Swiss-Prot record:
This is Zinc finger protein 724. The keyword Transcription regulation applies. One of its GO terms (biological process) is regulation of DNA-templated transcription. Residues 4-75 form the KRAB domain. May be involved in transcriptional regulation. Pfam families: KRAB, zf-C2H2. It comes from Homo sapiens (Human). The gene is ZNF724. PANTHER family: ZINC FINGER PROTEIN, ZINC FINGER PROTEIN 771.
Length: 619
């Protein structure tokens, strides 16, 4: 045999043979051939670049018509190669076995190293006269093109070659990082040079590795070769399928010794470790914000670019991340692949399932350093922190009002637009908040799930129960800075403050009358509509307001739940009790601006004002 050339370690395929290989096998073939060529260049053997290497570097198919005519197809070659390139085995080793079949004429016995001989050189000294494969390869070349089926051990070389066989002999001059394979160093160098030689004409995006371009192409084609046998979900990368399979097995093989937490993906463990170290190594040049993951920084950069390349085919909505598009599509398909083993509830996003599981475990891993309050969702902690900082980053462009959560701003905007997306199927009434619809539905069902442990009284809303409990405690934590008056509810204090400011932001479009509460405006509108939706089952009398119906019912029951602690007198309305208490305190909060006379009840002041009105008319 003559000196070793690239064609001695290369495999060529016909069109039919190439089509028998799947994408993973084709990509691996490219990488192995390029690596073998680079190794020959490194050893000073390859002089001119073969056509095959030029094709592979340009991302073209590794055959042409001229080469196809030269290669005769052996019987059964298609199966032969596909079998040798099984993904579940070492495909690289399989390719190297195919390479070595070219040297079968030398005889297998010439390739075998006897037990006890640690290098080709030692065996050559002992045997002396073999003319086969060992004559084709130098010691260093044997190391690079070894086949583990025939070679026992090539780890020890002569002193002259030892410097080439270190653990990571290929070192980057730019940053000092070492690699065990020359092709890995070549790929790494592109990070420093930012050469993206593999460009997709469809979207203009460029990559520094051909295999990354191949993967990216699948985004445009929608091609998903890798399907889960368990649930049928398909993926465009085999690594994504392997990661997905762990969901079904429940395996968590990556454990953090420091806190005992386990993960099913090694990258998740790496990310988790940063929580303990607090490291944020990836910084945005645009705004200076730092992240603990490079992928998070990449996603963040899209915010500055404003780019939304991932478009939904169903509704046209665009997203800046492919994962967000995947999640969004499940709205259209109704697909909920993530199921809770505890209660059977299913979700369309894995993160929602993770959050849901904490309901069963009671886990609250996100703790506020300011007050110690813990939460089961990180976003809730972020919102909570704004209570301490007073930050309100979400501002309404219409009126300038600011909010500490985006959801509150979204709800607020509906005041300006008049949008009411949540409709009651029972009566057709619409609401601008989902919580309002939920509360409204209880009117139809009559359900009162919230019960007071103190007195047994039941309520339709949890907020009403919270308000009611304060009656038993007598607590009034909300105090007016203007006049010192205290209230048991923050909403009552907010309403009260408008007395001092005179603010009436809620205006009726029908008659122009303004109110200081949205609920008062809502009740007022019923007057124009003539609607009386709240009907007494006892006598059939109808009312504009639910509170009026509640007060009316007391006539039938004779119930007087509001008792004066001073004298024991009981009343059927809380407002009547409030008026009564003034008798004991001597307080006269209602003052006439005309003459300065004060009264303990608003109605008495109203009556008094008429005296001045009559006096003015007489003049």
């Amino acid at each position: 045999m003559g000196p070793l050339t690239f064609m001695d370690v290369a495999i060529e395929f016909s069109v039919e043979e190439w089509q028998c290989l799947d994408t993973a096998q084709q990509n691996l073939y490219r990488n192995v051939m390029l690596e073998n060529y680079r190794n020959l260049v490194f050893l000073g053997i390859a002089v001119s670049k073969p056509d095959l290497i030029t094709c592979l570097e340009q991302g073209k198919e590794p055959w042409n018509m001229e080469r196809h005519e030269m290669v005769a197809k052996p019987p059964g070659m298609c199966c032969y190669f596909a079998q040798d390139l099984r993904p579940e085995q070492s495909i690289k080793a399989s390719l190297q076995r195919i390479i070595l079949r070219k040297y079968e004429k030398c005889g297998h016995h010439n390739l075998q190293l006897k037990k006890g001989y640690k290098s080709v050189d030692e065996y050559k000294v002992h045997k002396g006269s073999y003319n086969g494969f060992n004559q084709c390869l130098t010691t260093t070349q044997s190391k690079i093109f070894q086949c583990d089926k025939y070679v026992k051990d090539f780890h020890k070389f002569s002193n002259s070659n030892r410097h080439k066989t270190e653990k990571n002999p290929f070192k980057c001059k730019e940053c000092g990082k070492s690699f065990c394979v020359l092709s890995h160093l070549t790929q790494h160098k592109r990070i420093h040079t930012t050469v993206n030689s593999y460009k997709l004409e469809e979207c203009g995006k460029a990559f520094n590795v051909s295999s990354t371009l191949s993967q990216h192409k699948r985004i445009h084609t929608g091609q998903k070769h890798y399907k889960c046998e368990e649930c049928g979900i398909a993926f465009n990368k085999s690594s994504h399928l392997n990661t997905h399979k762990i969901i079904h097995t429940g395996e968590k093989s990556y454990k953090r010794e420091e806190c005992g937490k386990a993960f099913n993906i090694s990258s998740h463990l790496t990310t988790h470790k940063i929580i303990h170290t607090g490291e944020n190594a990836y910084k945005c040049k645009e705004c200076g914000k730092a992240f603990n993951q490079s992928s998070t920084l990449t996603r963040h950069k899209i915010i500055h670019a404003g780019e939304k390349p991932y478009i939904c085919e169903h509704c046209g909505r665009a997203f800046n991340q492919s994962s967000n598009l995947t999640k969004h599509k499940r709205i259209h398909t109704g697909d909920k692949p993530y199921k809770c083993e505890e209660c059977g509830k299913a979700f369309n996003v894995s993160s929602t399932l993770t959050q849901h599981k904490r309901i069963h475990t009671g886990e609250k891993p996100y703790k506020c350093e300011e007050c110690g309050k813990a939460f089961n969702v990180s976003s809730t902690l972020t919102q909570h922190k704004r209570i301490h900082t007073g930050e309100k980053p979400y501002k309404c462009e219409e009126c300038g009002k600011a909010f500490n959560t985006s959801s509150h701003l979204t709800t607020h905007k509906r005041i300006h637009t008049g949008e009411k997306p949540y409709k009651c199927e029972e009566c057709g009434k619409a609401f601008n908040q989902f919580s309002q619809l939920t509360t409204h539905k209880i009117i139809h069902t009559g359900e009162k799930p919230y019960k007071c442990k103190e007195c047994g009284k039941a309520f339709k809303r949890s907020s009403n129960l919270t308000e009611h409990r304060i009656i038993h405690t007598g607590e009034k934590p909300y105090k007016c800075e203007e006049c010192g008056k205290a209230f048991n509810l923050s909403s009552h204090l907010t309403t009260h403050k408008k007395i001092h400011t005179g603010e009436k932001p809620y205006k009726c479009k029908e008659c122009g009358k303004a109110f200081n509460q949205s609920s008062t405006l809502a009740r007022h509108k019923i007057i124009h509509a003539g609607e009386k939706p709240y009907k007494c089952e006892e006598c059939g009398k109808a009312f504009y307001q639910y509170s009026n119906l509640t007060q009316h019912k007391i006539i039938h029951t004779g119930e007087k739940p509001y008792k004066c602690e001073e004298c024991g007198k009981a009343f059927n309305w809380s407002s009547t009790l409030t008026k009564h208490k003034v008798i004991h305190t001597g307080e006269k909060p209602y003052k006439c601006k005309e003459c300065g006379k004060a009264f303990n009840q608003c109605s008495n002041l109203t009556t008094h004002k008429k005296i001045h009105a009559v006096e003015k008319s007489d003049k």
